[in-house]
């Protein structure tokens, strides 16, 4: 909502902006648990964005199976980008367990070393069926923005800053090709010590401020 109501949004040339999803819950279109439902309600329905610029992940009502949904979305991506897949920005929320997209700690998905869209049938966080980018596909973004807010995310943020283990803490090792930024509120940043030795690359950055 804060983004939707920002005065600069009215000046964005929306016909030149394409929207893709890095993960989605495999539920019917319009289900309140789907990420795209919130995106439409919070932003996309409020600006003149061409329908062909909005690339939703398949839904359980539209795809034949979860596996077909993963293949279909990967086909859409390769049809759009060819062999040179490059997203401008990938915005990722950080989970309390330091997961990003639907890449959960110690799962098989975090070990996949090629760029692709995966079908997840056993997510530890409901619903179990999801579609997700692999980490290598996420990292074909020029910028990766990681967003965390609230005290419940403080441990995850501390992991991101002090370790580099893509299996145990997937968010700790995801990088944009040009820039990686952590956007934090004060509660999420509470465990970061200014003089702490961190594994987070010096050329990356984190921004801590109150936001809504």
Q: In which residue ranges do the predicted regions lie?
A:
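Short acidic/glycine-rich loop or secondary-structure boundary segments that cap or lie
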Residues: 28-30, 64-65, 97-104, 110-112, ...
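Ligand-binding beta-strand-loop-alpha-helix segment within the catalytic cores
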Residues: 10-88, 202-205, 210-211
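A glycine- and small-aliphatic-rich helix-loop capping segment at beta-alpha/alpha-beta transitions
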Residues: 2-13, 37-41, 105-114
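ATP/nucleoside-binding phosphotransfer catalytic cores, i.e., glycine-rich phosphate-binding loops
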Residues: 136, 142-212
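Short, conserved loop/helix-junction motifs that constitute active-site signature segments
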Residues: 9-18, 47-49, 109-111, 136-141, ...
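Short beta-strand segments
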Residues: 21, 57-58, 90-94, 146-149, ...
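Class I SAM-dependent methyltransferase SAM-binding "motif I" and its flanking Rossmann-like core
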Residues: 90-136
